[in-house]
């Protein structure tokens, strides 16, 4: 399989494929390679049987009903086989499932030691100190502002989750 298969895509298609929370461009390329490997007839589509084999090769233990439901949920075209973008949606959904969200919630709780449901400047100062990081208040305030989506001076769990699942930061 060729690395860099996204390079020939249009800028819009490339952005659509690469802008996936939790996935780097290289990871998307690996998923593309798995998709192509299991697209046994070279049609650019994977049927339920091919999808099951592809998901298992990527380390997901799935049963047939799950695969068929995934195809029904993701196939926006005709209820038949799925294309690469739909396959990538399935993988992205699997990676962003409940377990990873729960893991991020545990990390959030380590910051939110006063259990207010938000991370404040005070929380950031404490964590920086515990980690032995010497950061100025201005640097910590800037971190807070970058993650704070509504400008209230606090980082909600949703803000934190968005930052933790993003590969590039604003």
Curated annotation (Swiss-Prot):
GO terms for biological process: positive regulation of regulated secretory pathway. Keywords: Calcium, Cytoplasm, Cytoskeleton, Metal-binding, Repeat. GO terms for cellular component: centrosome; cytoplasm; myosin II complex. Gene3D superfamilies: EF-hand (1.10.238.10). Signal peptide: none annotated. GO terms for molecular function: calcium ion binding. Residues 26-61, 62-97, 99-134, 135-170 form the EF-hand domain. Changing residue 44 to A: Abolishes Ca(2+) binding to EF-hand 1 domain. Ca(2+) binds at residues 39, 41, 43, 45, 50. Residues 1-21 are annotated as: Disordered. InterPro entries: CALM/Myosin/TropC-like (IPR050230), EF-hand-dom_pair (IPR011992), EF_Hand_1_Ca_BS (IPR018247), EF_hand_dom (IPR002048). SMART domains: EFh. It comes from the Eukaryota. Coiled coil: none annotated. Its main location: cytoplasm. SUPFAM superfamilies: EF-hand. The keyword Phosphoprotein does not apply. It is found in: Cytoplasm, Cytoskeleton, Microtubule organizing center, Centrosome. Changing residue 153 to A: No effect on Ca(2+) binding. Belongs to the centrin family. EF-hand 1 domain binds Ca(2+) with low affinity. EF-hand 2, EF-hand 3 and EF-hand 4 domains do not bind Ca(2+). PANTHER family: EF-HAND SUPERFAMILY PROTEIN, MYOSIN LIGHT CHAIN 1, 3. In tachyzoites, plays an essential role in microneme secretion that ensures parasite motility and attachment to, invasion of and egress from host cells. Also involved in the architecture of the peripheral annuli where it appears to regulate the localization of PAP2. In association with the myosin motor MyoJ, involved in the constriction of the basal complex at the end of daughter cell division in an actin-dependent manner; the basal complex is a cytoskeletal structure formed at the tachyzoite basal pole during daughter cell formation. May be involved in parasite replication. This is Centrin-2. It comes from Toxoplasma gondii (strain ATCC 50611 / Me49). The gene is CEN2.
